Design a protein with these regions (language model features):
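Conserved "turn/edge" positions that cap or connect secondary-structure elements
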Residues: 1-89
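Gly/Pro-rich, tryptophan- and cysteine-flecked surface segments typical
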Residues: 89-522
Length: 522
């Protein structure tokens, strides 16, 4: 597949799937979860009764094409050697490990539908005691829907969510909070499309003023045994085994406690003997370089696999913002990561950063190690070896109204550019400011079309923007789409780009903060 996660192949082995196969068949393997599916089968799941080989796969791994002499794959029966296409990834799924509806927390589920036809999404709420609850939501064509999870899942619940539909959609989960009555803010995540036996996180801090958690959802039928491998900047790898999450359940683990309440700048590789989903919420009072006391929170969905490149469309080192890069090297050899900073004006700036084996490195982009202050910047990080990178940012956001909203947000970079990006969440009402940050890493100029889908349906709002080559471009959505809108968005480009959606807010006039996500690519 395009992201390197899936591989298709033919093999004569009998023990790759259950029930056992015979003869040469075509399979697809998920390298993140280890799951193997039989592609050379009919609609009832029966294996082909003849030799199947010469497979190829679509970029998203949804379709596998192959030659086969089997006569029972379609109806009416075929004869001789024929070409077949098998669809393997239906329905569509999004998973969320984090979720809490207790005092001081408000959780929402945003469901976006960028097609003209209506669709139905089934949401399964999974609680820490192993019980579940199912709800069904109808999403009109060219629209989005917002679910109040506090009402749907019930009050005072630690809850994960599994969303599924027979049609393409996108799901995000936004949360707003007054954490322990001390720190206000919000965070947001795009759901994971499948569980995995490994999850990577580049960012993490257990020092003063920071509370870090790892939330784990086990949607499977067997208990999941976990091993936490923290790659600390200070002391290398620290392994913490011996934890488990029951089937159809979720659990939260405080990283500060797992690391004996010591102060570490740390990355994490989470390992499980059965596929799970993992997120990392963090809550903080950020002192930074100036003793600021900016309170807030952030949350990222982990990465199931590593990559050799990461793109970050958003970034600024202007007054009131501090931007960092955290780089994880879980491998056994030292690596060097090359950074290209794309500025709003001027030539790109290039730097190189060493990352020792089994550790993580941290770069303050505002400093001379990055690009310095008063810059709007996108970043490309590359390495010859697989690694992971995140970009935490902390702020006293002034925005369009000189607000003074403090908080932070964090994302894992996009592994590659794309021609289409989707966002389920978006709001331009009072006390919310939404932006789209577009990074064009190529030399050719891009014509970017943004289609906004209002909640409840209606005519989509379409806007077009020109984005020059090797530049970063920012769209103020409150101006571009208009005010007082709950919207999803599709961003299409004539050349591949990267898109993020930062949002800043004063939720209900009492909880200030911000959150950001990299868009979803089908």
């Amino acid at each position: 597949s395009a992201d390197g996660r899936y591989v298709s192949f033919d093999a004569p082995y009998t023990n790759l799937v259950t029930p056992a196969t015979s003869g040469t068949q075509v399979f697809r393997k998920d390298l993140a979860t280890g799951e193997v599916l039989l592609a050379s089968s009919n609609v009832a799941g029966a294996q082909g009764n003849g030799t199947s080989a010469s497979s190829s796969m679509s970029d998203d791994a949804r379709y596998v094409a192959f030659h086969s002499a089997a006569t029972n794959l379609v109806s009416p029966a075929s004869s001789g050697m024929q070409v077949f296409r098998k669809e393997l990834a239906a329905p569509y799924y999004f998973y969320f490990a984090e979720g809490y509806t207790g005092s001081g927390f408000q959780e929402y589920l945003c469901l976006g539908n960028a097609s003209a036809a209506s669709l139905t999404v089934k949401a399964t709420y999974l609680y820490k005691d192993g019980t579940t609850k199912e709800e069904t939501y109808n999403i009109p064509g060219n629209s989005r829907a917002t679910v109040n999870v506090n009402l749907a899942a019930g009050a005072d619940k630690e809850v994960s969510i599994k969303c599924e539909s027979a049609s393409p959609f996108i799901a995000e989960r936004s949360m707003y909070f007054n954490y322990q009555g001390r720190w206000t803010g919000g965070h947001d995540a795009v759901g994971a499309t499948s569980p995995s036996i490994s999850w990577f996180f580049a960012e993490g801090y257990t020092g003063a003023g920071f509370d870090e958690y790892i939330c784990v959802l086990n949607p499977g039928d067997l208990p999941a045994n976990l091993t936490f491998r923290f790659q600390t900047q200070e002391e290398g790898e620290k392994t913490v085994p011996g934890f488990s999450v029951p089937a159809h359940s979720r659990a939260s683990f405080k990283a500060n406690q797992l690391l004996e309440d010591k102060s570490y700048q740390t990355s994490l590789k989470l390992e499980s003997d059965h596929p799970v989903v993992a997120e990392r919420p963090m809550y903080f009072s950020y002192s930074g370089t100036g003793g600021y006391g900016w309170t807030g929170g952030s949350c990222v969905m982990g990465a199931p696999i590593l990559a050799s490149s990461y793109y970050f469309a958003e970034g600024t080192t202007r007054a009131g913002f501090e931007e960092w890069l955290t780089i994880q090297n879980p491998g056994a050899a030292d690596i060097s990561v090359h950074a290209v900073y794309y500025l709003k004006e001027g030539a790109p700036v290039e730097k190189d950063y060493p990352v020792p084996a089994g550790r993580r490195s941290t770069i303050l982009v505002n400093s001379g190690d990055g690009v310095g202050t008063e810059k709007d910047v996108s970043v490309l990080l590359t390495c010859t070896s697989p690694f992971l990178a995140e970009r935490p940012m902390y702020f006293d956001y002034r925005g369009l109204g000189n607000w003074g909203w403090t908080g932070g947000h964090c994302v894992i970079g996009a592994a590659s550019p794309a021609s289409e990006w989707f966002f389920a969440e978006g709001y331009t009402g009072a006390n919310f400011e939404e932006w789209l940050c577009i990074q064009n890493p190529g030399a050719a100029a891009a014509t970017v079309t943004i289609t906004y889908y209002p909640e409840g349906g209606g005519t989509p709002i379409v806007r077009t923007h020109a984005v020059g080559g090797n530049t970063r471009y920012t769209v103020p959505v409150n101006v571009d789409a208009g005010s007082n809108l709950a919207i999803s968005a599709k961003v299409s480009s004539t050349v591949p780009v990267i898109v993020e959606r930062p949002m800043y807010f004063n939720f209900q006039g009492k909880w200030t903060g911000g959150h950001d996500v990299v868009g979803y690519v089908p």
